[in-house]
Amino acid sequence: AVWKDFLKNIGKAAGKAVLNSVTDMVNE
């Protein structure tokens, strides 16, 4: 289904954003 792919892409993007935020906090 199209909406499933849509949600999957949002999930991936959100996951990357969270991961980047955590990495930035750890590096500082």
Swiss-Prot record:
It is found in: Secreted. This is Dermaseptin-SP1. It comes from the Eukaryota. Expressed by the skin glands. Probable antimicrobial peptide which stimulates insulin-release in glucose-responsive BRIN-BD 11 cells. One of its GO terms (biological process) is innate immune response. Belongs to the frog skin active peptide (FSAP) family. Dermaseptin subfamily. Keywords: Amphibian defense peptide, Antimicrobial, Immunity, Innate immunity, Secreted. One of its GO terms (cellular component) is extracellular region.
